[in-house]
UniProtKB/Swiss-Prot annotation:
Pfam families: Ribosomal_L31. PROSITE patterns: RIBOSOMAL_L31 (PS01143). InterPro entries: Ribosomal_bL28/bL31-like_sf, Ribosomal_bL31, Ribosomal_bL31_A, Ribosomal_bL31_sf. GO terms for molecular function: metal ion binding; rRNA binding; structural constituent of ribosome. Transmembrane segments: none annotated. It comes from Lachnospira eligens (strain ATCC 27750 / DSM 3376 / VPI C15-48 / C15-B4). It comes from the Bacteria. This is Large ribosomal subunit protein bL31. Binds the 23S rRNA. Part of the 50S ribosomal subunit. Zn(2+) binds at residues 16, 18, 36, 39. GO terms for biological process: translation. Keywords: Metal-binding, Ribonucleoprotein, Ribosomal protein, RNA-binding, rRNA-binding, Zinc. The lineage of its organism: Bacteria, Bacillati, Bacillota, Clostridia, Lachnospirales. GO terms for cellular component: ribonucleoprotein complex; ribosome.
Amino acid sequence: MREGIHPDYYQAKVVCNCGNEFVTGSTKEEIHVEICSKCHPFYTGQQKASSTRGRIDKFNKKYGVSNN
């Protein structure tokens, strides 16, 4: 392999907006993220019912689609 062409690899500190921090490998020394597994609704079990159901009903009503 040629020397000097590969980026440096660091033990990067990942910082979330919720305050959670963890370490991973990356070519950057520090990474800032908006959502992590500690605060994401899927992982915390605090998912809210989505409005998708209402949108589907609105579409079906608009175009006369029945659920048969």
